[in-house]
Amino acid sequence: MNRPPFHPCAAAALAALLAWPGGAACADQVADFYAGKEITILVGYGAGGGYDVTTRLFANHFGKHIPGHPTVVVQNMPGAGSMKAAINIYSVAPKDGTTLGVFASSTALEPLFGNKAATYDPRKYEWIGSLHRDIASCAIWKGAGQGIKTLPDLISAKKTVTFGSTSPTAITSQHPLFLKHMFNANLKVVYGYKGTKDVSLAMMRGEIDGSCGMFESSVRSAYEQHIKAGEMKIVVQFGRDRKVPYFGDATQMYAMLQTDEQKRVADLIFRQTELARPLAAPPGTPKERVAALRKAILDTIKDPAMVADAERLKIDYDPVPGEEAAAMFADFYKTPPALVEQGRKYTQPDPK
């Protein structure tokens, strides 16, 4: 039987660099590579939104936990619901561990749903991890003028309720459209916003009635004061197994699903937020550098200085290890094609 060539540093990578006896030497190789270099993290959304803020805070501490202590900078690359950044990391960025990307897990899964513009395979990225294991929700600003407080209220609204989104590939579009098609809710999605911050500002200005894709972590850091003031109401949350305190008495959508098949289709759409802000390296990045970066993301998020900064800004981090993130993306591809097609139909924008 032909065996692949043995690479000591790849073996050490699988042992988290140091557990294997040759790991120290590999760690030295990683340190030698990164010393004096700069790592760029591309964020697939505009400045000031949840993706941007949480990534920048993380980046401030990330470099000191990477062997060689490289400088880490963040660059915004919005476009097509973060697909522009996803394509860049897959096809354009150098495959050496100096360019990473943070983009939506929903965007990463667009090839599964047949999006021809999504010219990448999420199973081939080197997943470094995810900054959050999150649950999403939808919020309504001042009851949309109809006193909407729950998902049943939204479903039965007499006047069309509008939600804002960056693009059809984003959960700000997919989540409300799932509600529309699953429950026949009277709602519409308005596109063209550059980022989640722009969607939220439009909601507060009254251009639209609500916003979906509201992560548990973002609600605490950016919107808690509006909820307490009675201006904004979380009307539905998408966690399957737990309720989120910050979401108050919001309807749990899964409780309204009637069949196992409906729940499996919902899992395909809403379990993605367990990888709320995934961090990826290009396919082909050397394994020892991937292992070092995977260790560094976990070390960064438990760094006392990072924890203090996060608490000050009311940002919650609940990281997902890179190996687990990779396994989750692979699992999505094991979904039966008929259920994938249902999920695609439920999240398709209405014809213009």
Located regions from the model:
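Bacterial N-terminal signal peptides
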Residues: 9-22
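Hinge/capping helix and adjacent helix->loop/strand transition within the periplasmic-binding protein
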Residues: 39, 64-69, 88-99, 107-205, ...
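Boundary at the C-terminal end of the N-terminal hydrophobic targeting segment
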Residues: 24-27
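A ligand-binding cleft/hinge motif common to bilobed small-molecule-binding domains
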Residues: 105-117, 173, 177-182, 205, ...
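An extracytoplasmic/periplasmic, membrane-proximal ligand-sensing/linker region
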Residues: 35-37, 228-231, 235, 256, ...
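Extracytoplasmic "Venus flytrap"
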Residues: 41-55, 78-81, 164-171
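Ligand-binding clamshell of periplasmic/extracellular solute-binding protein-like
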Residues: 58, 80-83, 97-110, 130-133, ...
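N-terminal secretory signal peptides that target proteins for export/translocation
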Residues: 1-6
